[in-house]
Amino acid sequence: MEKKFMRESKAIKTTRVFPNDLNNHQTLFGGKLLAEIDSIASIAAARHSRKHCVTASIDSVDFLTPIHQADSVCYEAFVCYTGKSSMEVFVKVIAENLLAGERRIAATCFITFVALKDGKPSSVPQVLPETEEEHWLHTTGSERAESRKKGRGKSKEMAEVLTLSKPWSM
């Protein structure tokens, strides 16, 4: 099976926070952050697999510190764990106060993509960690994959009991 270094999938994007990006608390709107996370993660997944990829799940997003208008936001994404056709992408969000020069981890996210060929799941290369950060993410990946598998089963079970009736006609 083909293997690739995690760094080969790395995608980085830096943006500036503008007034129209802010919520009523004068911090970056969470939906804007999630859209950027999904976008940068999709690049890492496609770069790793060299195939069309679809977002299977946003597994966890932890908003650690607020992001303000004086900040720039750097998104770093790379594939940190793989299954047969799935890829777990880690996204690290770093905010930098452009006036003070202070940097901080503002958010982290694990997001799963599935590689497709002719509309069907297709195999992906395994990943090779090099740095301490990559080794930790890779080593803990199987635990997160198992948790996702259990959660997906529960979601399917829940979908069976959810109603499709129109709430306005009850």
Residue map of PLM features:
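Compositionally biased, charged N-terminal/linker segments
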Residues: I12, T27-S42
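A conserved, well-ordered hydrophobic junction motif at loop->secondary-structure transitions
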Residues: D21-L34, P167-M170
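Residue-level recognition of the GNAT/N-acetyltransferase active site
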Residues: F18-P19, L64
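HotDog/MaoC-like acyl-thioester-processing domains
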Residues: R7, A11, H68-Q69, C80-M170
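Hydrophobic beta-strand-centered segment that forms part of the acyl-chain substrate-binding groove
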Residues: K3-E8, L28, S42-Y81, S85-E88, ...
